[in-house]
């Protein structure tokens, strides 16, 4: 298992607000929670940046973290990430913050400690670009969106 350094920035983390953890053995992501002093209502169409009270340092350039939406919040309440996906580089050491966008027609209130997103650690391959005049021909070629069909 890969070790990731986590710094607690708010004394409530690990006390009244749980640390991120995997819910089950098969969980790919850990829930990130809102580190708020009071409830926060996000009006329709509004975006808010919400702190999690933790900073992390992955340290290994072979890994990165992504912040992804929680499916229930998006499907049931229209609360998704304002930047769609958050990418945390291995050398970042600051607080994890979640951009929450209310795309619904109803206001949504986030309570202190609510689960607002999930954190997934992923392997990274850094590629080196090689300039060429032409590519080796493939069946797909330059066919883009929808080119491979529907079935």
UniProtKB/Swiss-Prot annotation:
Keyword Acyltransferase on entry: no
Disulfide bridge positions per record: none
Name of the protein described by the UniProt record: Deoxyuridine 5'-triphosphate nucleotidohydrolase
Pfam families attached to this UniProt entry: dUTPase
Organism: Idiomarina loihiensis (strain ATCC BAA-735 / DSM 15497 / L2-TR)
Alphabetical list of Gene3D superfamilies matching this protein: 2.70.40.10
Organism lineage string: Bacteria, Pseudomonadati, Pseudomonadota, Gammaproteobacteria, Alteromonadales
Known EC number: 3.6.1.23
NCBIfam families in UniProt: dut, PRK00601.1
Entries under InterPro entries matching the protein: dUTPase, dUTPase-like, dUTPase-like_sf, dUTPase_trimeric
Function: This enzyme is involved in nucleotide metabolism: it produces dUMP, the immediate precursor of thymidine nucleotides and it decreases the intracellular concentration of dUTP so that uracil cannot be incorporated into DNA.
Broad class of enzyme this protein falls into: hydrolase
